[in-house]
Amino acid sequence: MSPDGASWSINTFDRGGKATVSFVGSDRSDLNPRRILSLWGNTNLSDPRIHFTEDSLSVTHIPLDAFFKLGLYSKTGMAVFENKQQRLTLSFEAPPIESLCDHGCNFELYMCSRFLELEPLGARTDIAPGQCASHWEDWYLEPV
């Protein structure tokens, strides 16, 4: 039997700035739960750095002592980070929820006082000796 795992990239950004990730559901008329949000134990949803809109989650990097981590499923597979007059758009896979580790999340976000991480996750896969696994992400950098 092959090990079961998933590829995961950690993109680390300097303090300051704001990250926004799409959090759109599949169909607003669908009455089943389709918007996944996973919280690590120390995450406090009343943290002033976290902001929800109808279609997205935004976090503003403010160097507070408390750190947090959360994950979600982004159907559009897109996150944006703006800092120092630059905008980085990060596009990544949106595989079926059932194929993902970490409770169906394809994107995780970690913040501490010194930096912020944007973390796309690939689909769960079996990997045999001599094989490889990967996921894709595209970066697009532009001035703001």
Give the predicted meaning of each segment.
Residues M1-C132:
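A contiguous, surface-exposed recognition patch within enzymatic or periplasmic domains that forms
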Residues C132-P143:
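Short, hydrophobic/aromatic-enriched beta-strand segments in well-ordered soluble domains
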